[in-house]
Amino acid sequence: MMTNGVVHANLFGIKDWVTPYKIAVLVLLNEMGRTGEGAVSLVERRKLNQLLLPLLQGPDITLSKLYKLIEESCPQLANSVQIRIKLMAEGELKDMEQFFDDLSDSFSGTEPEVHKTSVVGLFLRHMILAYSKLSFSQVFKLYTALQQYFQNGEKKTVEDADMDREDGEKQMEKEELDVSVREEEVSCSGPLSQKQAEFFLSQQAALLKNDETKALTPASLQKELNNLLKFNPDFAEAHYLSYLNNLRVQDVFSSTHSLLHYFDRLILTGAEGKSNGEEGYGRSLRYAALNLAALHCRFGHYQQAELALQEAIRIAQESNDHVCLQHCLSWLYVLGQKRADSYVLLEHSVKKAVHFGLPYLASLGIQSLVQQRAFAGKTANKLMDALKDSDLLHWKHSLSELIDISIAQKTAIWRLYGRSTMALQQAQMLLSMNSLESLNAGVQQNNTESFAVALCHLAELHAEQGCFAAAGEVLKHLKDRFPPNSQHAQLWMLCDQKIQFDRAMNDGKFHLADSLVTGITALNGIEGVYRKAVVLQAQNQMTEAHKLLQKLLTYCQKLKNTEMVISVLLSVAELYWRSSSPTIAMPVLLEALALSKEYRLQYLASETVLNLAYAQLILGIPEQALTLLHMAIEPILADGAVLDKGRAMFLVSKCQVASAASYDPVKKAEALEAAIQNLSEAKNYFAQVDCRERIRDVAYFQARLYHALGKTQERNHCAMIFRQLHQELPAHGVPLINHL
C-alpha cells in the first residue's frame, strides 16, 4: 500500500517506514559522516547536531525547507546534500539501492561513525530494516515518489529565488529548531510513523495547555488527527487529543465521542499497564465515567454529570479504588457547591486527599475552601494562612499549575476585599514568575487561565486609575496571547467590554454604553442586567431601572451573590434620592452597609458610607455627613478607583459648603477656600478618567464659590468651562445637588 509517497505494509506491525523525506535525512547523515572534521567547523557541527533531533522526530517537510534548515547551520553541507539527492533522483533505481547498501557500512569498523544504540544509529537501523522488507514494486513506487519529491523541491526553490530577486528587502524569517508544527509542513507529509505521531501529539498537547496560539488551528489539527486515525483507528492518544481539540470549539457531541473512544482504545491496546485484564478494564470504565461527568459539568449539563458521577462512584466502590473515589468526591462538591452543607463535603475531601497522599487534590480542595470562605466573609489573614499551607504543598511537589492558580486567587481575593494595591502586587508577581514546567515544543510562555485572570485584573486596575493607555496595552497583549477562538478568550472579552462601558458612561455617551450591554450580557448575564439598569438610570428612565434592579436583587439574593447584591442596593438607593425620596434610601443603604460589614467587603462598605453621607447631606445634616466621610474617605483614597476618589472629594466640598452656612464671615471664607481646594482635587481626579459631566458640575460649584468670595476673574474662568461643557453635554434635567 502506498499513500503520498509513503510505502508501508502493515501499519500495526511496522513502527517506521521509508519516505522520500527520510531518504533526504539519510543523505544528510551520510554526508555528515563522509565530511572530514576540518571541512565543518565546531560551531557548524554543533548546530547540525541540534538540528538532527527535530528532523528525526518531526513530520515530513518539503525538500526546499530542508535545504534552508541545513543551509542555516552549514551552507557547504547543504550544497553537498542537494547535489547528492539530485544525482540519486535523476539517476537510476540502482543508485538508491546502492545508497541503502552503503548505509550498513556506518556501523562497521573498530570505531564506527555511528553507534547502534544512539538516536541516529536507531534511526538508520529502522530505515535499513524497513527498506529491506519492501517488495520490488514498493521499491519502484518509493523511487518514483523520491523523484516527485525532488522535482517539487526544485520548483519551490526556483520560486523562492525569483521572489528574493523581486523583493530584496524582505528577509527570510529564521525558523527555530524547536518550533511548533506548521500547517503547511503537516499538509505536505504523508501518514506519520508511530514515533512521529507520538512526537506530534505530545507537541500539540503541550501547546494546547501552555500556548494555544502556536498550536494548529482547530480545523487543521482535527484534519491531521482524522488522518492519523484513518490509518490507526486504535491510537488512543489521538482520540484524547481530538477530545481536547473539540473542547476548544465547544463541540459537546464530538468531544464526548472522542472521549469515549479514547477509553475504549485504552482497553483494546492494554495501555493501562495492568497485569490483571479485569482490573484494567474496570479502571478504564470508572475513569471514563468520571471524565464524562467532568465534561458534562464543563458544558453546564449538571443532571447528566450527576448521573455519570454516580456511575463512576459505583464502579470505584466495587473495585475499592480510593483514588478514583477522591476525584469523585471533589466533583461532588463542584456539582453541589450551592448547597449550604457543601463546605462539609469539601473539608472531608481535603482530609481524605491528604490521607491517601494526593497533594494535587488536597491543594485544589484547600483553594476551593479559601474561595468559599472568602465569599462567606472570613478575614483575609485566615484565608492567606490557608493559601500559605497550600503553597507549601505546591513547592514541595513542584505543582507549577497550582502555584499560578494560588497567586491568581490571591489577586481576586484582595480585589474582593477592596485592596487594589495588594491585588496589583500579586498580579505582577504571577506575570513575572517562571514556570516550573519544562519548556518544550517551542513554548515560551504559560498561557493558562491563571495568567488570563491576572492580566484581566491588571487591565481593570489600570483602567480604574485612569491609565487607559496602559489598560489598552494589557488588553492588546491579552488578545494576542489568547485569540478569540481560544478557550480563555471570554475573560478578556468581558474585561474589555466592561472597561469600554465605564469609559462611555464617564464621557456621558449613554447610547454607546447601551450598545455595549448586549455584549456584556452574552458573556455574563448578571453583569449585563446590572449595567442595563445603570444606563436606564442615567437616562432618567427610573421606573424601568427600578423594575430591573428589583428583579436582579431577588435573583442575586437567591444565588447568594453578596457583592452584586450590595451594588444593586447602592443603585436602588441612588434611584430613590434622585427621585427626591432620600428617606426611603436610608434603610436600603443601611442594609447594604450591614452586608458589607458582615462579609468584610471593605471597599464596598466605604462606598456605602459615602452614599449614606450624601443622603444625610440631602436631609440637611451636613455635619453628620462630614463625620461619616472621615470614616470612609481613607480607604477610598488609598485603594479606590480614581472616579470614586473624585466623588469623595466632591462630596466633602459640598458638605463643607453646607456646614459653613451658619459660620461667621471669616470662618465661612476659610471653609469656602478649603472647599475650592477640594473641588480642584476632585476635578483632577475626574479629568484622569475623562468624566466631563462631573467636571462640568465641579466647574459650576467652583464658579458659585468664587462668586461668593468676590473673586471675579476665577469665577469667570470656571463659568466659561461650565458653559463649554454644558453646550457639549446633554442636560437631563437633574438638579446638580442630586448627583453624587
UniProtKB/Swiss-Prot annotation:
Pfam families: ANAPC5, Apc5_N
Gene Ontology MF terms in the entry: protein phosphatase binding
TPR repeats, residue ranges: 194-234, 235-285, 286-322, 323-363, 364-403, 404-451, 452-485, 486-525, 526-565, 566-605, 606-645, 646-681, 682-721
Signal peptide: none
GO cellular component: anaphase-promoting complex; cytoplasm; nucleus; spindle
Alphabetized UniProt keyword annotations: Cell cycle, Cell division, Cytoplasm, Cytoskeleton, Mitosis, Nucleus, Phosphoprotein, Repeat, TPR repeat, Ubl conjugation pathway
Residues annotated with Phosphothreonine modification: T217
Recorded metabolic or biological pathway in which this protein acts: Protein modification; protein ubiquitination
GO BP annotations listed: anaphase-promoting complex-dependent catabolic process; cell division; protein branched polyubiquitination; protein K11-linked ubiquitination; protein K48-linked ubiquitination
Main localisation: nucleus
Annotated localization: Nucleus; Cytoplasm, Cytoskeleton, Spindle
Positions bearing Phosphoserine: S180
Oligomeric and partner information: The mammalian APC/C is composed at least of 14 distinct subunits ANAPC1, ANAPC2, CDC27/APC3, ANAPC4, ANAPC5, CDC16/APC6, ANAPC7, CDC23/APC8, ANAPC10, ANAPC11, CDC26/APC12, ANAPC13, ANAPC15 and ANAPC16 that assemble into a complex of at least 19 chains with a combined molecular mass of around 1.2 MDa; APC/C interacts with FZR1 and FBXO5.
Function comment: Component of the anaphase promoting complex/cyclosome (APC/C), a cell cycle-regulated E3 ubiquitin ligase that controls progression through mitosis and the G1 phase of the cell cycle. The APC/C complex acts by mediating ubiquitination and subsequent degradation of target proteins: it mainly mediates the formation of 'Lys-11'-linked polyubiquitin chains and, to a lower extent, the formation of 'Lys-48'- and 'Lys-63'-linked polyubiquitin chains. The APC/C complex catalyzes assembly of branched 'Lys-11'-/'Lys-48'-linked branched ubiquitin chains on target proteins.
Family classification: Belongs to the APC5 family.
PANTHER family attached to this UniProt entry: ANAPHASE-PROMOTING COMPLEX SUBUNIT 5 (PTHR12830:SF9)
Protein name, per record: Anaphase-promoting complex subunit 5
Lineage: Eukaryota, Metazoa, Chordata, Craniata, Vertebrata
